[in-house]
Amino acid sequence: MRILTLLIGGVLGLAAGAVTALFAAGMIGSGASVGNQISVNGWNSDWTIGSTAANPWTRARVARHGLLALTKEEAVYFTTNIDTDGNRLSENCTYEVSGGDMPGQWWSITLYDATSYLPRNKDNALSFDMTKAAASGDGAAWSFTVAAEGPETGNWVSSHKAGDFDMTLRIYKPTPELIADPEGVLPTPSVKRLACGGDA
């Protein structure tokens, strides 16, 4: 009887440990808040990514979410899964994402599905970047549409087959000011919901 009790206790302990690890790694639920969390107008980051201060949970989340884990001097990452009104981003809706100059040498915004992978579509339109912003006329005041189907005109990032999705802003070679004070320096892109399926 004592052996059975020990076995049951061991199994329960292992199960609890596994669930905790998966949760912290972001493989179930939304993940634990670990590391040095930064949040600016719904765009979130972890300032320990790419540093020796990153603990195992942070490193597991980085691996899960496909970030390159460069040092902050090389690149910083901000992710959002909500629009400017706080609603979850969804393939069923159309959004306008807009912004201006970013404090770094180059930047990009990429869309990922609910499993943190690129959506499985063939639209060849999963990101927008500084080069495209400059090519469209004004790199200091840019915008693009996020929708499952492309607009007749303008820049487009496809959410087709993305379900509930998020977007990651990468800023390469960020300025020292951004590294020192991200909350005060980052000019966060606006994510405005224009319409959703079923809207009149």
Walk through the language-model features, giving the residues of each:
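A compositional/structural signature for long, glycine/proline-rich flexible linkers
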Residues: 1-200
